[in-house]
Amino acid sequence: NALRYFRSGGQQMNGWRYMASPDDAEENWYYFKDGRAYSTSYKTTEACGYGIAKIKGETYCFDKKGRMRTGLVELSDGRKFYFDSDGKMKTGRIVVNDDNHDNEVFYFTTSGSIGKRGDGFTGVKDGSLYENGRLVSAEEGMKYEKVTVDGKTYVVNESGKVKTSGTVTDADGVKYKITKDPNGGY
């Protein structure tokens, strides 16, 4: 059931090809090795329904039909990865501008093995709080908000910065004295 591609002289295709597959009229990018498209089950590290592969120093994602994926990709286990419009995995802090997540800030891990590197980070990074990659912040109009992420309680401001000491008052007049608690939150 693998997608195969041969040139007119019968040579097996190697490299990138933008085309429609026989069972899909929509054109997509595919990467071929020895005439066969990279997919979830070929030349990739399988990650919950997708195949992730390093090609010429960049990391890409392919679905089971071999189509290169772009944008925010959510795996069946809930992990998220981000691939730019050229299909290259992005790591670190980025702003995602697409139809579903207009101007949202994410943080994707910068180290780890293939299939783990680039997944959405959960916890505090550079003073900001993230959950599955997405920046957690106080609701608009609230100066501070108490939130729970991964079983730990934090107080964050509208820009997602974690308050680590002192006393703060939220928009409803509720005061919070900030101290580090035993489970790692504040």
PLM-predicted stretches and their roles:
Residues N1-Y186:
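Extracellular adhesion/carbohydrate-binding repeat motifs centered on closely spaced tryptophans
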